[in-house]
């Protein structure tokens, strides 16, 4: 048996829960699933690209709209706290120096019933390039929300089965870093992918 925490409630990253899973000899992958090509992974990659190319990221936002029950539930603003933390930390973790709180806004924004299971994300990054010149990126991402996470969940299940076969317990750091927004240890996405490939090598 293993546990997958695909929602933004922090379990796999918490020492208390990690110890309990280790004591029981069970693997856990979490927390908060990162879609195959969703707003978080796109935002992370662009934020990292700014840094890698020597552009200072000054301000950024990510606004998300959807029509499914996930977005409907988040109309109750008290449910947004952990989701905003999860999505914001996922992006901030890719920066050498975190942006001030007032310069980053990331989170679910509203429920639009006629979108049904579609999700729209608007992402903007404002930066300063060589010679103190402004450099801005703005994009809109449209996805079918539910299936965008399905393949990721399947790959996470595969990693957990490998963990069971190898008798590895507790938080599976490589799988959590690659497949989840809020793992116990954040990695660059290319590093996390390589770590998953190494972990999955059963030879």
Regions found by a protein language model. Give the residues of each.
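Rossmann-fold NAD(P)-binding glycine/threonine-rich loop
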Residues: 1, 6-27
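Flexible, active-site-adjacent loop/turn segments at secondary-structure boundaries
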Residues: 8, 170-173, 177-178
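Active-site-lining helix/loop region of Rossmann-like oxidoreductase modules
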Residues: 19-169, 173
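N-terminal charge/polar-biased segments
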Residues: 175-203
């Amino acid at each position: 048996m293993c546990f997958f925490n695909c929602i933004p409630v922090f379990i796999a990253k918490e020492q208390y829960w990690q110890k309990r899973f280790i004591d029981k000899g069970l693997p856990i992958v979490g927390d908060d699933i990162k879609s195959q090509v969703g707003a978080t992974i796109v935002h992370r990659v662009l934020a990292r690209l700014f840094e890698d190319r020597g552009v200072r990221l000054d301000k950024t936002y990510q606004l998300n709209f959807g029509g499914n029950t996930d977005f409907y539930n988040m109309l109750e603003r008290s449910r947004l706290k952990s989701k905003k933390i999860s999505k914001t930390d996922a992006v901030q973790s890719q920066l050498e120096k975190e942006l001030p709180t007032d310069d980053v806004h990331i989170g679910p924004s509203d429920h639009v019933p006629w979108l049904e299971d579609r999700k729209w994300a608007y992402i903007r990054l404002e930066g300063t390039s060589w010679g103190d010149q402004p450099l801005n990126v703005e994009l809109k991402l449209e996805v079918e929300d539910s299936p965008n996470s399905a393949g990721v969940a399947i790959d996470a299940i595969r990693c957990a089965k490998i963990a069971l076969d190898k008798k590895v317990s507790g938080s599976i750091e490589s799988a959590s870093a690659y497949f989840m927004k809020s793992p116990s240890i954040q990695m660059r996405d290319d590093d996390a992918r390589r770590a998953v490939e190494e972990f999955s090598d059963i030879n």
